[in-house]
Amino acid sequence: MKAIATAITVLALASTAAMAQSPYAGMQGRSIKALSAQQIDDLKAGKGMGLALAAELNGYPGPMHVLELSDKLALSAAQKQRIQTLFETMKAEATPIGLSLIGQESALDRQFANRSITSDALREATTKIGQTQAELRNAHLKYHLETAQILLPDQMKQYAQLRGYASDSPARHHRMH
């Protein structure tokens, strides 16, 4: 009986210690603390990283996903070419902005790591990072607007269904053109 009580005590202490651990534990080894390796890769590749969810989830498809679904959406050759061009332009615009964001986050991280950060430097760095994040988000969102102008109403509905966004809400089915 004493062995069972000891085992229960050990388990209780272990679970308490595990619960006390920060959700950030393990992140201290990142090269840039604020960005995961996946986020860095996505920024380098010009990927959206959910930055255009306001558009995507409100009926404005993104060019990449439209291209992925081009056969099921029955895009015409002209539509496909226009959307391919949008996608390439978006990626070409977003990639250097993403690289800039990586550099800015790295510089901020270094200042904290070197303990050289000041209030003024912090304000300047975070302002620049915020501006760059806004540029990056805009670089993705605006291509959702343009993509919606290319698709027909039935293709917009089909896209929403294929992506799992279809709803009976009348607001979902109005034309975005």
Predicted regions and their residues:
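Bacterial N-terminal signal peptides that target proteins for export
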Residues: M1-I8
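Extended aliphatic helical segments
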Residues: I8-V10, V66
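N-terminal signal peptide c-region/cleavage motif recognized by signal peptidases
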Residues: L13-A17
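Charge-rich (acidic/polar
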Residues: Q21-H177
